[in-house]
Design a protein with these regions (language model features):
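Histidine/cysteine-enriched polar flanking segments
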Residues: 1-119
């Protein structure tokens, strides 16, 4: 699915007719809920969380604000790679890596939790 999306993007242009630059980020994980983590989430009418269930983690869930990129730290094996890729792609920004597993456990990450609230 990711490769199909990449092929579609490669064939598109922005409103000024420029090719879209694609920056590939590594995939963390696979990451899963531990039994302790799954049991520690308050029950709600949303999705249940089960031990061993895979977490939906992505380095693309970052936030750009005031000359900084706030990047979720997800996996010690791939965090540094993601930081380097984004720093090279966005040299005018300071990359700030933030431990964010607790946010990930509830679903989503930095970009998701900073979205606007409609009036």
């Amino acid at each position: 699915l990711s490769r199909q999306a990449e092929q579609v993007l490669k064939s598109q242009h922005d409103a000024k007719g420029r090719e879209i630059e694609i920056v590939r980020l590594p995939l963390p994980g696979p990451l899963h809920y531990s039994e302790r983590e799954a049991n520690g989430i308050d029950a709600s009418s949303g999705m249940s969380r089960q031990a061993g269930e895979r977490l939906s983690a992505s380095y693309a869930n970052f936030l750009i604000v005031n000359g900084h990129v706030f990047l979720p730290m997800l996996d010690e094996d791939t965090d540094a790679i993601a930081i380097d890729i984004l720093q090279n792609a966005m040299p005018e920004y300071q990359i700030i890596a933030i431990p964010s597993r607790e946010v990930l456990l509830g679903g989503g990450n930095i970009h998701c939790i900073t979205q606007q609230i409609p009036a």
